[in-house]
């Protein structure tokens, strides 16, 4: 079953997809993480919502620099406190 997105989630993921399609090919592969920062941002927004997902994405982008080793860095799972 597909999860419906809020209008803000749709807008954020559309902007990121626009970056992936229009800008990223011109820059070439630069991300040192797997998945790339843009895919991470989309997944974080879909998993955690726009505000928290954007926070995770911003922290990830700030780590994406030559002094960080990079590697595998998946989106953390959603902490659902009601089901504990």
Curated annotation (Swiss-Prot):
Pfam families xrefs: YidD
Listed InterPro entries: Membr_insert_effic_factor_YidD
A single cellular component GO annotation: plasma membrane
Membrane topology summary: Peripheral membrane protein
Localization annotation: Cell inner membrane
Main location per the UniProt record: membrane
Keywords, in A-Z order: Cell inner membrane, Cell membrane, Membrane
UniProt-listed HAMAP family: UPF0161_YidD
Family: Belongs to the UPF0161 family.
Function of the protein: Could be involved in insertion of integral membrane proteins into the membrane.
PANTHER family given in the database record: MEMBRANE PROTEIN INSERTION EFFICIENCY FACTOR-RELATED
Record-given protein name: Putative membrane protein insertion efficiency factor
Organism per entry: Shewanella frigidimarina (strain NCIMB 400)
